[in-house]
């Protein structure tokens, strides 16, 4: 573990990673650390500095993204979303083909609404039971599940438009 980080303000790391909408801070910092060959916990400690939570300003400098972009895309930067246990419990990996399409080779964990259970673009199950990429089953032979998921999503949007 790196314990002797410089006391100077952080500079952007050499490698950046894509920040996905509703991605957890834990997932983003893990991917950023792996891209730069740094232990993830060391990067989180450096981004947090004195507090136990990642500081949005420090993370913005390290990642190369503007602060407002990170605050808009990442979940876990505000006081009510910071709890790491809550982030792990609420997060699910998004469709592995969607991440591969954007050139991301590792899982991206996002806070997905409960009604979002299928990636319709790739026909993959991404519901709450899909906690790993291996759990994302193809629905090619289960068209009724995909149709039901689409109807459920439309119903949720109609009755709760802010979702």
Protein language model regions, located:
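A structured, charge-rich N-terminal accessory region that forms the first stable segment of a protein
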Residues: 1-91, 110
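Domain-exit/linker segments immediately C-terminal to small folded modules
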Residues: 12, 120-163
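Short linear functional motifs in flexible/disordered or boundary regions
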Residues: 44, 107, 130-132
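Solvent-exposed, non-transmembrane amphipathic alpha-helical segments
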Residues: 49, 79, 115-118, 139
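Short, cysteine/histidine-rich loop/knuckle motifs that typically chelate Zn2+
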Residues: 94-98, 118-121
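Short functional micro-motifs and their immediate structural scaffolds
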Residues: 100-104, 124-127
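A contiguous catalytic/ligand-binding core that recognizes phosphate-bearing ligands
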Residues: 101, 112-113, 120
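Short linker/helix segments within small regulatory modules
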Residues: 106-115
């Amino acid at each position: 573990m790196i314990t002797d980080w410089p006391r100077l303000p952080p500079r952007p790391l050499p490698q950046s990673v894509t920040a996905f909408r509703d991605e957890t801070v834990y997932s983003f910092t893990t991917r950023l650390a792996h891209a730069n060959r740094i232990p993830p916990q060391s990067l989180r400690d450096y981004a947090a500095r004195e507090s136990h939570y990642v500081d949005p300003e420090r993370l913005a400098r390290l990642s190369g993204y503007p602060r407002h972009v990170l605050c808009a895309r990442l979940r876990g930067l505000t006081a009510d979303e910071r709890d790491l246990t809550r982030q792990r419990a609420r997060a699910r990996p998004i469709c592995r083909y969607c991440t591969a399409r954007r050139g991301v080779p590792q899982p991206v964990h996002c806070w997905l609404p409960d009604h979002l259970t299928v990636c319709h673009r790739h026909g993959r199950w991404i519901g709450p039971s899909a906690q790993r990429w291996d759990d994302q089953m193809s629905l090619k032979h289960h068209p009724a599940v995909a149709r039901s998921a689409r109807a459920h999503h439309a119903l949720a949007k109609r009755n709760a438009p802010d979702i």
